[in-house]
A protein has these predicted regions:
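C-terminal catalytic/acceptor-binding lobe
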Residues: 88, 105-167
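Short aromatic/hydrophobic "clamp" motif used to bind/position activated sugar donors
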Residues: 9
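A recurrent flexible, glycine/aromatic-enriched loop bordering the glycosyltransferase active site
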Residues: 73-96
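Short, high-confidence coil segments that cap the C-terminus of an alpha-helix
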Residues: 6, 35-36, 126
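Short, conserved alpha-helix that lines the donor NDP-sugar binding/gating region
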Residues: 1-2, 119
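A generic structural signal for short hydrophobic patches within well-formed alpha-helices
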Residues: 99-102
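Conserved donor NDP-sugar-binding/catalytic core segment of glycosyltransferases
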Residues: 17, 22-62
Length: 167
């Protein structure tokens, strides 16, 4: 974040391929609302008590490819609004218009840095949204999942943001 003074920043996994050429225009259109701080492509409207975003009802749309399958993941087809407000987004793609410090003091790996950053944006008073997409804006070619430290970081997340709720 400190490497650039750009107002808008996009954080993207190394295994994500963008498929919508003009997505930046959609992102800028959404960011015209100054109350929106972050945009993701997959998120949850209500973060579950166990802190695991993937255990909640998700919204968004991506193509996904991993060791088990290759498919279009559709979590929501609600096209009544240009976007849906969420409590957390997946870190595969995060666009921001404000600089909120990452909690590198707590999260040093692949797990929970994204949900933590989502909580930091909410604490700062900003909305987090997932845009309506008629087709996915990216392919996530995740291959093998490495969850070696997932439970460790989940407990840290729960302690920091959810009062130690250890479901």
């Amino acid at each position: 974040m400190q490497e650039s003074d750009a107002k808008y920043k996009i954080y993207i996994h190394q295994d994500v391929f963008l498929t919508k050429r003009d997505m930046i225009y959609d992102i800028l259109r959404i960011f015209k609302d100054s109350s929106i701080g972050m945009i993701g492509l997959i998120g949850t409207q209500k973060l579950p008590d166990d802190g695991c975003m993937w255990h909640g009802k998700r919204v968004g749309r991506i193509y996904t490819n991993n060791i088990l399958s290759s498919k279009e993941f559709i979590a929501s087809e609600d096209n009544e609004k240009p976007y849906m407000q969420v409590e957390a987004v997946d870190g595969l793609f995060m666009a921001t218009q404000y600089d909120i410090t990452w909690r590198e003091d707590l999260f040093t790996g692949w797990d929970f840095y994204d949900v933590s950053q989502s909580q930091e944006f909410l604490k700062a008073g900003y909305k987090i949204v997932v845009p309506y997409m008629d087709k996915p804006w990216c392919i996530h070619d995740e291959g093998f999942l490495n969850l070696d430290r997932y439970e460790e970081f989940r407990k840290i997340f729960l302690e920091e943001y959810m009062g130690g709720n250890n479901h």
